[in-house]
Regions:
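Non-catalytic interface/targeting segments
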Residues: 1-45, 97-111
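Short active-site-adjacent helix-start/loop capping segments
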Residues: 38-40, 65-69, 90-91
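Short amphipathic alpha-helix with an adjacent loop that forms part of the alpha/beta core around
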Residues: 45-51
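C-terminal structural segments of small proteins and small subunits
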Residues: 79-107
Length: 111
């Protein structure tokens, strides 16, 4: 997936990918106000480019909680809630359903 110019709730995840909006994506996923795209799991420039449209950042670190270097985001005034991908997907879907200005980065689970 290069770019999907909409945000969708995540319908399911696992086996190394995500399902949303009658589509699927294999690999890590970045969800920004402008849309959804593949993510390498370490580049936070997409969040920074759209920071004026983001109130909440959720990062899913895979099947287990991992530390991530978020200094780049924090230097731009963005603070991320880091949790497992399962918890992050649930949090993202809830906030998206409430029409909150949320962005997310999800590391894939179970390749």
């Amino acid at each position: 997936m290069k770019f999907l110019p909409q945000r969708h709730a995540i319908a399911s995840f696992g086996e190394g990918g995500f399902r949303f909006g009658d589509m699927s994506h294999q690999g890590h996923l970045l969800v920004l106000p402008s849309g959804m795209r593949a993510w390498d799991g370490i580049d936070f420039s997409g969040f920074i480019a759209e920071k004026d449209e983001i109130d909440f950042v959720v990062i899913g670190t895979g099947a287990s909680l991992k530390r991530m270097g978020l200094g780049t985001l924090e230097a731009q005034g963005l603070y991320a809630d880091v949790m497992t991908t399962s918890a992050a997907v649930h949090s993202f879907n809830l906030m998206l359903g409430e029409a909150r200005r949320v962005a997310a980065g999800f590391l894939a689970v179970g390749a």
